Structure formats: structure tokens, C-alpha cells
Amino acid sequence: MWSSIENMKANLHKIVLDVHEDDEEEDDLHKYGSANGVSNSDRRNSSGFRSVSRYSISNGIESPAHHEIERYKAEIKKLQESESDIKALSVNYAALLREKEDQISRLNQENGSLKQNLTSTSAALKEARTDISRGSNNYAIKGNNDQSPNRLHKSVSHLKSPNHMSNGKGKDTDSFIKEKDLADMLEDRTKSMAAVQATELAKEREKLRDFQLSLQEERKRSESFKEELESMRLDKNKTSMEISKMRSELDAKLLEIKHLQMKLTGQESHAIGPGMEHLKEVNKALEKENNELKLKRSELEAALEESRKLTNSKVFPDATESLTRHPSTLDKEKPESFPGKEEMEQSLQRLEMDLKETQRERDKARQELKRLKQHLLEKETEESEKMDEDSRLIEELRQTNEYQRSQISHLEKSLKQAISNQEDNRLSNDNQIRKLKDTVDDLNQKLTNCLRTIESKNVELLNLQTALGQYYAEIEAKEHFERELAMAKDELMKLSARLKDSDERLESSNKEKEDVTSKLLHAEKVAAEWKNRVTKVEEDNAKVRRVLEQSMTRLNRMSMESDYLVDRRIVIKLLVTYFQKNHNKEVLDLMVRMLGFSEEDKERIGAAKQGGGKGVVRGVLGFPGRFVGGILGGKSAELHANAASDNQSFADLWVDFLLKDAEERERREAEEAAASKAKQDSERTRQEAALHDSEFSTVPLRSSESNQRLSR
């Protein structure tokens, strides 16, 4: 209920603000219609539209005329924008017209000055006419015959018939025609002179172009010769560098060859010398051993022969031959034949073994000698091959050196010839360049003289052409400005017609505004009726509060009498609800207060810490539990008599009532907190809106006391 009333209040306040802003807009429009002013109305209307858009109805009941008001305001805004555009266009056209008028006045002044200049020039022409006619009569006649025969015919006809015009007007026209003819003659003469000079200049320019082309070709040739000289110098430097490199390489190769020869000789001396000496020593040692072995063998053979002879001569004189023939058969004979035979055989065996070893050593020495000889031969062949290769390399290097020397000499000769040719070409080029420079200087002098004469003639032509061009330009500018004036007048007529249409539209919009204001007045009347109803409801609430206070005082008095009486049915119901609701804190708090527990009992139960806050019994208008218990204990018989017929008893109903009342009170407190927050937010928005629209604020509809009353 309270939220709907607040929404109605906010909507009515917005409607009132819109109505006041519409009144301000109408005043501004009337001012605009009276004095053709746009800035004030635009500013007011823009603020009005901002306020409307700011106060968009979102919370409660929308007024039926709100959309129509917005639509009308949008149309009014469009009309005002079109009016502002029309006014800006009119201002721009007025500025353009002023500029055009200023330009026309300037052109008139320039025309007057040109007329004065023409009069002065005509006087000067009259004075110089006699001189010009004497000096250049024949040339002017020729030019007129070639270029403008019609003009000559006209001038002659005018000169031959002076007597036809007898009045003053005829004389004036004759003088004007003569001046025109003279001006035409001067123009023809200047044009013919300019054409002749132009042809001469063209010829001279062609000659200059030819000379310049020849100069450019000679410069290109000289540059090409210079490039060739530079290339020849570079080639010479390259060849000299190559020759120096080849000489350095030859010196390095000769040094390497010398080092190789030295190394070869040293290696031969180092490798062959000790090998040969070692072989010689080994050979000598082997020869000595061989001689010693031969001597021992000969001695042993002699001793053997002597011993054989002795044995054969004593025991077996016929066996000497068999021993000499078959010495190996001695082993087969019995050892008992000769007592020193075994020792002799052993010594012979030893000697044979020594001989075999010496033979083996001799063979080994011979093999080593053969191997060393072969090795020496191989080394000699390798060294000879190396020497042959070195000699070949030396010969090849000598041949290359000779070939390079011949090339160097040939290149030096060609360089000398090229240098001499270059010097000759340079001298010839220098002579040609000098001649060309002289010719160029002469041509430049001629060019400067011709250009000076051309410039002087061009200045004269330009002066005459500028005078004529200014005259024709002024005439064309006048015609152009007249056309623009006509166009501007047509556009002004169109803009005035548009302004009339916009005024008619404004009148229709004003009528629609009046209809909207009548609807707003009706809405204000409805709001006043709602205010009266709200005041009546507030009075009824005040009466109900007074009755409640009286009943509360009575209940307090009754509770003092029945303070220690509680109905057992209430106690039973409290216990049952406590266990049913899983030891609810609120039910326990209610039991503690209704039964009047002491501090020790509370500590035993554990309700001392849980006390405080929003209890169930406080939900019933804020009275203690003992008071409620006293009431029920004092009137237990009456309650028992008036109990319902169904299963629920009065105690059950009473406890349910207390719990429901507590829940309702908590919910009410939450709603009140939310309403207070919303109220604070709305008040902030209103304050911001009031600060923002302080320029266009109106007198408030109701006082602050009524607003406070409605918020309560």
C-alpha cells in the first residue's frame, strides 16, 4: 500500500514538472513569434526534454497522456530545429547578399576608374595619332589589308562621309568611331610586330636548341673519353698490380726451390752417410767372423784328419778311406771301437752346429745387404724422380716468367700508345670545347639581347591586354552578379514560404499543447483526490494506534496480577514444538520467558548465551513471556471452555499465533528496511534532479511536511 502511494506521488510530481516545463516552452515560443529569437527556446526545450527523459516512469502507474506528451514534444523539437536551420540559412543568405553588394560597389568604382583611364588614354591617342599616322601609315595599311579589310572599309567609309552627320551627336559618334579605328590599328600593328618577333624568336630558339644539342653531344663525347681514360688507368693499375703479384710469386717459388734443393742435399747426406757406414761396419764384422769361422773350420778339419789318420793307422789301417768317403757312417759304428771317439763326435757336432749358425748369420747378413742395397737404389730412384720433377717445375716457371715478361712488355707498349692517344684526344677535345664555349658565349649574348627586346615588347602587350581584359572581366562579373542576385531573390522567396509553413505548424502544435494541459489538470485533480484519501487513512491509523495503546496499558495492569500463573497446555505445546522443530532457538527463548527461568536454570539449559535478539514473544507487540503466561494462567478456565471442538486446543492456537506473529514482524522489518533504502535513493535522485534543473525549477506542489507525512 505504502509503496503504491509513493509511486503515485512520484508520478504526480513528474507530471507537474512536465506541465511547468511545457508552460515555459509556450512562453518561449510566444517570445520567438514576437521577436524571431531562437536561442532561448532551444535552450529551454532541450532542458525540458532532458528532464522528461530523466524522469522516465519505471516504478509504478503510467499516466495515459505521457506518451502523447512525449510525441508532441518530439514534434515541437523537430519544428524548432527546422526553424533554427531556416534562420541560419537566412542569416547566411543575408551575409552572401551583403558580400555581393559590396563586390558590386567595388566593381562600379573600378568601372569608374577604368572609364577615367580610357578617357586619358583616348586623349593620349588623339595627341599621338598624327605622329603614328605619319610614321607608320604604310605598315598599318598593309596589316589592315592582310588582317582586317572590313575594318579599313568601315574606317574609310566613315572618313569619306563626314558631311552626312550635321548635328552634335553625329560628330561625337564620328570621333568615337575614329578612336576605335585607331585602337584597332594599334592592336593590329602590335599583333603583327609580335608575330614577326615571335617568328624570329622561334628561329633563334631553334638555333640555340641545335647549338645546345651539339654541346650536349660534345660533352657526352668528352665524358666518354674521360671514362675511357679512367678505365685505361684502372687497367694499367690492375696490370701493374698483377705484374707485381707475379714477380712476388716467382720470387717465392724460387726461394721454395732453393729450400727444397737444400733439404734434398741435406737428407741425402744424412740418410745415405750413416746407412752406408753402418752397412760397411756390419759387412766388416761379418767378414771378420766369417774369416774366423773359416780358420776354426780349417783347424778343426785338420785336427779331425789328424785324429782319423792316427786311429786308422793304429787300429784300422784300411778304414781311412771309408772315413774319408763316408764320414757320416762313424755314427753307426759301435762306440766300443775307439775310446775318444764320442768326444770327437760331440766336438764335431758342436762344430757343425756352429757352422750352421754362422751360415745362417751369413745368409741373414747377405739378405740385409741386399735389402739395404735395394732400399738405397729405391731412394736414389725417388730422389732422381724428385729432381726431375723439380727441374721440370723450374723449367715451367721459367717459361711462364718469360711469357709474363713478354706480356708485361706488350702491355707497357700498349699503355704508352693509349696514353699518347688519350693525350692527343684530350688536346683535340680541349680545342673543340674552347671553340664551342666561344660560340656559346656569342649565342648567349644574342639570346640576352633578344630576350630583353622580347620582354619589353611583352610588357607592352601585357599592359594593353590587361586593360582590355579588366574591362571585359568587369562586364562579365556584372552579369554574373546580376544572375546571382536573381537566384538569391528566388531562394529568399522560397525560404519565406517555408517560414510561413513552419509558423502554421507551430500554431497547430500550440493548440495540441493546450489540449495536453487540460488533460494534465484533470490528472492533478485525481491526484488531489488521492491525497485526501491518504489523509483519511492516516487519521484512521492514528485512532487505531490510540486504541492499541489503551489496550496495552490494560494488559500491563492485568499481567501484574497474574505474573506467576501459566497454563500447562501451553507448556506442553511449547515442549512439543521445541522437539518437533529440532530444538529451535526461538521456541526455547519463548519457553524461558513464559515460564520465568532463573539465571541458573538458563545456564543449565544453555539459553543464557542465546538470549537477546528477536524472540518469538517480542513479536507480540514487545511484551514479556510471563505477561502472556499470566494472562493465559488467569483465564485458563475460560479458554478451556471456549476451546474449539476439533483436535487443536487453545494453547496450540496461541503458540501458533505467537510464532506467526514473530515471522510477520521480521518480514515487516525487512520490508521497512528495503522501503527506507528505496526512499533514500529516490530522495537522492530528486535532489540531483533539482540541482540539475535549478534554472528551470518551479514552485513545489506540496510542502515538506506533507511529503514527510506521505513517506511515513
From Swiss-Prot:
Residues 23-49, 135-176, 306-347, 666-712 are annotated as: Disordered. Residues 328-344, 678-695 have a biased composition (Basic and acidic residues). Residues 65-134, 197-313, 340-558, 659-690 form a coiled coil. Keywords: Coiled coil, Endosome, Golgi apparatus. It is found in: Golgi apparatus; Endosome. Disulfide bonds: none annotated. The keyword Coiled coil applies. Residues 36-49, 135-150, 696-712 have a biased composition (Polar residues). Its main location: Golgi. GO terms for biological process: Golgi organization. One of its GO terms (cellular component) is endosome. Residues 557-608 form the GRIP domain. Golgi matrix protein playing a role in tethering of vesicles to Golgi membranes and in maintaining the overall structure of the Golgi apparatus. Interacts with ARF1; preferentially with the active form of the protein. The C-terminal domain (551-712) is responsible for the Golgi localization. This is Golgin candidate 3.
